[in-house]
């Protein structure tokens, strides 16, 4: 790839700046050089030399300042990206020893993007530098007076060790701006070179600073040779001189600080590590608010004012990097000082970068790049707090990825203890000796309190038992501040008493607790960067509104306060107060902490304004946007309630408890009780018993609120300045009173509002109780009795077949009784809109044929005896049966003795008659069926004897009549027609039967009904046997007897109880009887007239027609003739001789069809009604009833029409008759029906008309037309 020199733009200098080298570019042969080089043309040798110079590697420029326009070797951790961003405008020179690095996208490095954009703007505004390369200065993007430079000695310790191992040169440095892709690679290199890193970690502090000073001096001297550069070098020299002065002061004050610490060791007492829940997800205060407050607080003065007098290094504890978009990218004062300040490598400081990552020596690999951790450089103990905090952050995220809490705790505690063990504890003490250095470092590193809080909260989230031992602390006053604030310096060190490793913690000043609680509620404007992940964010800002105290006593007057299981303590005036956070105590975490407070109660009281406390609670609740709103409000209200209750129970000094937001994992409980009771509080033992109940209840409540597996591990830091109105303690306790039962003997003190509310609830519950009175019981008894009577009445109506009465039925006699309670207009309304659905029933009404009271009148199963039949037994079986009793005779019959006895011998007639009668009267249906089987087998066996001159026995007409008469059928029902009567009458039938059975026994035996219900099994058994007899012996009955049997069967089929029973056996017997009639053509008309007289109801007549089988020729003929006879009867026509020819029958059917008009039938009925009752007028109800009857009759007539037309095969000659029938059906019947939604019977009739018309159309289509005629034309009626 070659590069060309582009022509200079108008207004752009065409010659390079003085002292700069000409630009490296290729020139075409014959082209002119720039104006500065003259107008000569280059020779081929010059061109070759220029090409060589172009590809010649450039000299190392790693000693230039960041502000230098030349290309610097300070890279983004080996990525090859220059800080000045000049790589965007020229091609990089590749090194043979180093692979070409990757470019960092602007999304991953917002600083680089801002630098590149700034480079373009600088290029447009100020032209080019002397090397014709666009340059830019970092001072443009920094605050006024701020300089930026990052010496190599302040890189992370592990990075320095890895570079020493790899390059063996202390002057090869990398930029502090770290890229995401190379961080993991360096972590792997650190793991491989862990042994060498430990050896190289013992490098002396003087050597490291010697390399730093050499690098700084080289950069400063180099920057003087470049005119036009910024004053960054001069500023840096001032910073360097200030630092060396600080180092000299530290060395001079080592011994003094060590002696003072040793003097305070005598007053220290053993305590445990404080695992207080602190500000996980602390919010940073807005920059403009803190800047105003910093000016008002003298304690937050600038470092340069105290040490150097340099105003460019102003620092504030709440300053942090704020990224407000890609267009605005400025360094804060804190960031500037961190980049320009000098820190020794020995103390393992944590570096802050503009990128979204923070790397430390102990930072785990799984910290995401989106996290922004605001930490500071403080004393050695605070550094370890931050290290532990970052470890716990990594552990917290590991837990969220599925790793158990216990394994995560063991992981990071092992790493921390291994590093702590190798530390030189004496050097840790020496670093914090001088008071001036402590003050300076305290101002620079004020966020250490938040780091300690994060360590405590993260240790709580592990739920592992940690048994620390406290270390002594000392009180140090700050005379240079106007507030005279004293601070407890908290140390975390390692002691080995008895060979056991213990983490030791020094109690903190209550003032620090107030600062931390205030810092927890301060929102951060930069929190939107960390809201996209679930990691805990450590804020570097603290709230400046600290509690002012007049003075504090000496360290010798301090007393230790233990943590115990009580959450609330009633302390009188002057009692020792504590501001430790109280959270639910987990049974498996026996942790405790010691807190140093003065014994002087007057000086120890720390009043906290109620307004600040409410603001803190409000902001705490608004800071956690990842939780649901209901859970968030409930938790905040619970915390507020506990705080108010604990403060309200203190009589003299208020016990102010400050609560930080809950940790990601369920925190361990740390509670405070005084280990040494105060002399001024003799009633602590008594008050502790009263407070145990409330404490235990609150523990359970907190445990239910916080011990959840669904707790989120991250919190958002979006600021929410709105304050919500909190409910009072009485309201909250009233809501939760039912869910917090007391465990102690004394109930907890309930407020007045709570007592009043509970009393109201009790009164409401008592008012809603249900009480029985005498009047109510009497009323219930009456209602129950009335319902029982109604139920009995309904059952009786159903038993009698009347059904359930309804006022919707019109025309019924019972409906008027039910509607007596209704008004007349209501009754008329019901009649008008009532729907009539039962005008045309689906089944025929039937008749009562069997009278069960007369059943068994002639004989029964107990009077029938084979010995009284005159039978004389010859075989052994017959003798055995004759010797047996009545019951044994039936038993031997059913067991097959008679079948075996008469297998080869003719059965005597008395035995067959006895079996036939016993089968008809026996009440046991199983026995009746067995007897039928025996009787049929014997009959069939007797028919096989062809050599016998006697026909097998078949029951005579009198035997059949006697059996049915004994079942309860009257003699008139058996023979209903007067013209067709048998040779015997009822008296003869009874006398003959009694003679055969023995008259004495029958007379002496008492009479009692045999059947209480229809003996359908017995009836069907008799019909089956008759069917067998008519089949075996067709000539057994004469034509007259056959006709009487047919009429008998038709009459018995009208029985109401037989409507739901399929009468297949009846039809089989009818087929045999019709087939056995010898003179069929003569007898068919007489049979039709006799069947037509069996009933007067049209629907019963239709049932008789449908009972005739139509699968035989005689059956179809009987159906046709019977239908025509019935139609003539129903239409009041004269009985004429039924023509035998089919064509004539269809012609007669057309004449009847014209008379089936519903309106004409209604007129006839009305006239008939008036003739019968001339004095009565026909009202609407009667007219409606007559209309129902007319449509009912039309329905029956149409069915009979269908039976006539569809009961035989038709020829092509009958086609024209069916065409005429279709026309008459549509004209006279279909067109006369007016359907109504309330009159369903009309629709039912019209439906039947459509079905019949469809059948006729099918017949017409199947018939062949007349010769020479293709279509049927309409012919008008004559």
From Swiss-Prot:
GO BP term, example: protein localization to site of double-strand break
Region Disordered: start-end pairs: 1-235, 248-337, 443-491, 509-582, 598-724, 739-764, 798-820
Signal peptide: none
Region listing for NSE6-like domain, in residue ranges: 769-1271
Domain of life, source organism: Eukaryota
Ranges of biased composition (kind: Low complexity): 643-654, 666-675, 688-697
Biased composition annotated in UniProt, kind: Acidic residues: 707-724
Pfam family, one: CANIN
Biased composition (Basic and acidic residues): 39-50, 118-133, 156-174, 180-199, 248-258, 449-463, 469-489, 609-630
Polar residues compositional bias, start-end: 259-277, 318-329, 519-540
Keyword Protease: no
UniProt-annotated location(s): Nucleus; Nucleus, PML body
Keywords for the protein's UniProt record, in alphabetical order: DNA damage, DNA repair, Nucleus, Phosphoprotein
Region feature Interaction with SIMC1, mapped onto this chain: 740-1278
Phosphoserine found at: 591, 708, 712, 719
Subunit: Forms a heterodimer with SIMC1. Interacts with SLF1 (via N-terminus); this interaction links RAD18 to the SMC5-SMC6 complex. Interacts with RAD18; this interaction is increased in a SLF1-dependent manner. Interacts with SMC5 and SMC6.
Family designation: Belongs to the FAM178 family.
Name of this protein: SMC5-SMC6 complex localization factor protein 2
Lineage: Eukaryota, Metazoa, Chordata, Craniata, Vertebrata
Gene: Slf2
């Amino acid at each position: 790839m070659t590069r060309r020199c582009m022509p200079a733009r108008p207004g752009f200098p065409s010659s390079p700046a003085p002292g700069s080298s000409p630009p490296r570019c290729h020139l075409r042969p014959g082209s002119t050089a720039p104006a500065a080089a003259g107008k000569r043309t280059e020779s081929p040798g010059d061109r070759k030399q220029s090409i060589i110079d172009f590809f010649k590697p450039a000299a190392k420029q790693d000693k230039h300042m960041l502000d230098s326009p030349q290309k610097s070797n300070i890279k983004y951790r080996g990525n090859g990206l220059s800080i000045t961003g000049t790589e965007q405008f020229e091609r990089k020179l590749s090194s043979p020893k180093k692979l070409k690095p990757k470019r960092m996208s602007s999304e991953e490095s917002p600083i680089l993007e801002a630098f590149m954009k700034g480079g373009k703007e600088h290029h447009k505004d100020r032209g080019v530098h002397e090397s014709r390369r666009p340059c830019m200065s970092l001072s443009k993007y920094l605050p006024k007076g701020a300089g930026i430079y990052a010496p190599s000695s302040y890189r992370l310790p592990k990075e320095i060790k890895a570079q020493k191992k790899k390059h063996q040169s202390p002057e090869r440095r990398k930029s502090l701006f770290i890229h995401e892709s190379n961080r993991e690679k360096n972590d792997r290199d650190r793991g491989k070179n862990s042994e060498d890193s430990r050896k190289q970690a013992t490098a002396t502090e003087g050597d490291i600073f010697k390399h730093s000073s050499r690098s700084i001096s080289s950069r400063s001297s180099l920057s003087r040779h470049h005119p036009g550069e910024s004053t960054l070098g001069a500023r840096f020299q001032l910073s360097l001189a200030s630092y060396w002065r600080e180092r000299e002061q530290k060395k001079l004050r080592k011994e003094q600080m060590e002696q003072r610490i040793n003097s305070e060791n005598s007053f220290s007492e053993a305590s445990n590590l404080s695992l207080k829940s602190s500000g996980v997800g602390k919010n940073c205060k807005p920059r403009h608010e803190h800047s105003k407050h910093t000016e008002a607080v003298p304690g937050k003065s600038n470092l340069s004012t105290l040490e150097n007098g340099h105003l460019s290094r102003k620092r504030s504890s709440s300053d942090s990097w704020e990224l407000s978009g890609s267009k605005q990218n400025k360094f804060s004062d804190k960031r500037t000082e961190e980049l320009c300040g000098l820190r020794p490598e020995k103390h393992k400081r944590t570096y802050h970068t503009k990128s979204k990552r923070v790397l430390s020596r102990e930072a785990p690999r799984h910290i995401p790049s989106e996290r922004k951790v605001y930490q500071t450089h403080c004393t050695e103990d605070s550094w370890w707090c931050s290290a532990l905090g970052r470890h716990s952050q990594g552990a917290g995220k590991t837990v969220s990825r599925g790793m158990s809490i216990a394994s995560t705790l063991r992981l990071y505690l092992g790493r921390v203890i291994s590093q702590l063990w190798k530390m030189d504890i004496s050097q840790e003490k020496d670093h914090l000796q001088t008071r001036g250095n402590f003050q300076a470092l305290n101002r620079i590193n004020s966020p250490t309190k938040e780091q300690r809080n994060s360590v405590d909260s993260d240790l709580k989230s592990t739920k592992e038992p940690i048994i620390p031992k406290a270390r002594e602390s000392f009180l140090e006053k700050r005379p240079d501040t106007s507030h005279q604030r004293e601070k407890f310096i908290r140390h975390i060190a390692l002691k080995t008493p008895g060979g056991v490793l213990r983490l030791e913690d020094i109690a903190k000043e209550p003032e620090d607790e107030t600062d931390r609680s205030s810092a927890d509620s301060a929102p951060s404007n930069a929190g939107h960067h960390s809201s996209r992940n679930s990691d805990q964010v450590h804020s570097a800002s603290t709230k400046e509104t600290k509690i002012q105290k007049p003075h504090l006593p000496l360290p010798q007057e301090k007393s230790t306060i233990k943590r115990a299981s009580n959450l609330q303590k009633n302390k009188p005036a002057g009692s020792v107060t504590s501001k430790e956070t109280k959270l639910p105590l987990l049974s498996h975490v026996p942790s405790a902490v010691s807190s140093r407070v003065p014994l002087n109660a007057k000086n120890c009281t720390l009043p906290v304004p109620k307004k600040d406390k409410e603001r803190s609670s409000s902001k705490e609740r608004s800071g956690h946007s990842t939780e649901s709103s209901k859970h968030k409000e409930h938790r905040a209200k619970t915390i507020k309630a506990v705080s108010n209750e604990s403060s309200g129970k203190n009589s003299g000094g208020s016990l102010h408890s400050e609560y930080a937001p809950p940790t990601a994992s369920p925190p361990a409980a740390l509670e405070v009780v005084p280990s040494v009771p105060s002399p001024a509080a003799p009633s602590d033992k008594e008050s502790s018993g009263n407070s145990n109940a409330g404490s235990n209840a609150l523990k359970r409540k907190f445990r239910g609120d916080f011990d959840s597996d669904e707790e989120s591990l991250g919190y958002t830091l979006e600021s929410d300045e709105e304050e919500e109105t909190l409910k009072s303690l009485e309201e909250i306790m009233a809501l939760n009173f039912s869910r917090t039962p007391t465990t102690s003997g004394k109930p907890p003190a309930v407020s007045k509002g709570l007592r009043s509310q509970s009393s109201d609830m009790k009164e409401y519950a008592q008012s809603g109780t249900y009480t029985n009175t005498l009047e109510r019981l009497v009323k219930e008894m009456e209602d129950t009795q009335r319902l029982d009577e109604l139920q009995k009445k309904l059952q009786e109506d159903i038993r009698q077949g009347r059904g359930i009465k309804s006022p919707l039925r019109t025309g019924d006699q019972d409906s008027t009784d039910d509607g007596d309670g209704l008004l007349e207009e209501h009754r008329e309304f019901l009649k008008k809109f009532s729907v009539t659905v039962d005008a045309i029933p689906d089944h025929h009404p039937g008749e009562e044929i069997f009278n069960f009271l007369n059943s068994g009148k002639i004989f029964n199963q107990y009077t029938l005896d084979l010995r009284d039949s005159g039978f004389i037994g010859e075989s052994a079986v017959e003798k055995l049966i004759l010797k047996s009793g009545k019951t044994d005779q039936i038993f031997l019959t059913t067991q097959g003795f008679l079948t075996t006895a008469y297998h080869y011998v003719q059965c005597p007639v008395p035995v067959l008659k006895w079996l036939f009668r016993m089968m008809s009267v026996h009440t046991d249906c199983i026995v009746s069926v067995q007897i039928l089987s025996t009787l049929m087998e014997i009959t069939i066996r007797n028919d096989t004897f062809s050599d016998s001159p006697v026909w097998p026995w078949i029951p005579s007409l009198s035997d059949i009549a006697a059996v049915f008469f004994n079942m309860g059928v009257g003699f008139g029902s058996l023979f209903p027609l007067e013209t067709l009567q048998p040779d015997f009458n009822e008296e003869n039938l009874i006398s003959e039967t009694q003679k055969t059975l023995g008259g004495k026994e029958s007379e002496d035996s008492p009479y009692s009904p045999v059947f209480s219900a229809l003996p359908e099994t017995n009836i069907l058994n008799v019909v089956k046997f008759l069917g067998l007899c008519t089949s075996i012996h067709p000539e057994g009955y004469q034509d007259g007897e056959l006709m009487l049997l047919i009429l008998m069967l038709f009459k018995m089929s009208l029985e109401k109880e037989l409507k739901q029973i399929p009468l297949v056996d009846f039809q089989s017997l009818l087929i045999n009887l019709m087939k056995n009639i010898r003179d069929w053509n003569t007898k068919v008309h007489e049979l039709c007239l006799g069947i037509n007289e069996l009933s007067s109801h049209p629907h019963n007549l239709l049932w008789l027609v449908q009972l005739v089988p139509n699968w035989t020729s005689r059956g179809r003929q009987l159906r046709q003739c019977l239908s025509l006879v019935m139609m003539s009867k129903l239409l009041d026509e004269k009985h004429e001789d039924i023509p035998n020819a089919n064509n004539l029958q269809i012609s007669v059917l057309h004449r009847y069809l014209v008379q089936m008009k519903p309106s004409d039938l209604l007129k006839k009925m009305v006239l008939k009604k008036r003739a019968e009752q001339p004095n009565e007028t026909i009202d609407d109800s009667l007219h409606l009833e007559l209309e129902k009857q007319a449509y009912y009759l039309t329905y029956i007539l149409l069915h009979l029409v269908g039976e006539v037309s569809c009961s035989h095969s038709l020829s092509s000659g009958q086609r024209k008759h069916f065409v005429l029938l279709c026309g008459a059906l549509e004209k006279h019947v279909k067109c006369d029906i007016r359907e109504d939604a309330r009159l369903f019977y009309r629709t039912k009739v019209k439906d039947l008309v459509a079905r019949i018309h469809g059948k006729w159309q099918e017949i017409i289509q199947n018939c062949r037309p007349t010769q020479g005629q293709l279509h049927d034309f309409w012919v008008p009626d004559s």
